Amino acid sequence: CNCLIDRKGRLHEEFVRVSPTFIQEDLMYSLDRVGVDYFDLYLIHRDDPHVPVEALMDKMEELRIAGYFKAFGVSSWQPSRVAEAIAYCKRMNYRGPSVSSPSYSLVHAQYNRWPGTWYADDEFAQWHKDNNIALFAWAAQGAGFFADPPLPAYDPEKAPMLTKESFLTEENFERRRRAMELAKVHDCSATNIALAYVLSQDLPLAAQIGPQNSWELEDCIKAMEEIKLTPAELDYLRIKRDTYED
């Protein structure tokens, strides 16, 4: 197992820091705080559509050549901006972004749950494979949506309106029910089924998870090493068929 140092640019909720100047400033701050000379991978966290993508890519190529990171990517960028960045880098013969990091999970988000974030649907996920760019799926387990018992955050009576509109849909509750059903078949948790669903996609994909202790980490590893979902089970979770049996 190799150690990968992945550092995103700092996120400030009170103002946007996506510009060539701020990117360099935050990169230097992060290197100093972590105590390393370079990062294996550096991601621009969030986006500001008002800043020309050309200026951002020029700066990232400059910093890459200077040796501050080996590769870079973007996090929660909408598809058109990622495509624009790749196209510009090809024209300029830059290395370009190697990674795009939207959220991608068994949950089908109707809307972006938080401002400035982006949730990938199956079409955008497939786009990564077609364009040879890795998909780093954050909240790959559905942000706790498949926990049993359900988390208070997903109580229809108490959840914030944006969560209700984005996550608490009839489709997602059916996906949750089916994940719990398959969990009994595979002798695991529904959260593991949700993670196995993401890992089973035929995509250049890495799943970002958030275990809070060693037991949860070991449980997540089980989804990677032991749970092999069949094509019928994957379609069942997508609600494309009525049974998971072939």
Where are the language model's segments positioned?
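N-proximal short alpha-helices
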Residues: 12-15, 29, 166-167, 190
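Short, acidic/polar
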Residues: 16-34, 83-87
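Beta/alpha (TIM)-barrel catalytic core signal, keyed to glycine-rich beta->alpha loops juxtaposed to Asp/Glu
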Residues: 47, 51-245
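N-terminal small/glycine-rich loop or linker at the start of catalytic domains
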Residues: 1-14, 38, 43
